[in-house]
Amino acid sequence: MRHRKSGRQLNRNSSHRQAMFRNMAGSLVRHEIIKTTLPKAKELRRVVEPLITLAKTDSVANRRLAFARTRDNEIVAKLFNELGPRFASRAGGYTRILKCGFRAGDNAPMAYIEFVDHAEATAPAAEATAE
């Protein structure tokens, strides 16, 4: 019986799932928006949101926990230097999922997952280059 078992299996074994979400979390932190299937986006939210919460308080212990979950020093640096301070005043809900139709090959529902302030973070840079 599967009573109280949370999370989607996504037709993968546990190590494949863990590696996939570790890579997807790194891509989301690096690019701040990625396109994936809707079920993967919903599960990725459960991985990324605790990382942002961890990054809000900068300590050696939190950096080591973040590294254990991402295995990438570049991602840890961006989490603690940029994303943690950016979301310091927000109490959760750091990501947004936008549905974007269906994939051509297998009709899988697709979605963008991004950080909620992604538009505001990129808009000033675009204005600065226009001037």
From Swiss-Prot:
GO biological process: translation
Domain of life: Bacteria
Key words of the record: Ribonucleoprotein, Ribosomal protein
Annotated Gene Ontology cellular component terms: cytosolic large ribosomal subunit
Alphabetical list of InterPro entries matching this protein: Ribosomal_bL17 (IPR000456), Ribosomal_bL17_CS (IPR047859), Ribosomal_bL17_sf (IPR036373)
Alphabetized GO MF terms: structural constituent of ribosome
Subunit structure as annotated in this protein's UniProt entry: Part of the 50S ribosomal subunit. Contacts protein L32.
Family: Belongs to the bacterial ribosomal protein bL17 family.
Descriptive protein name: Large ribosomal subunit protein bL17
Organism in which the protein naturally occurs: Sodalis glossinidius (strain morsitans)
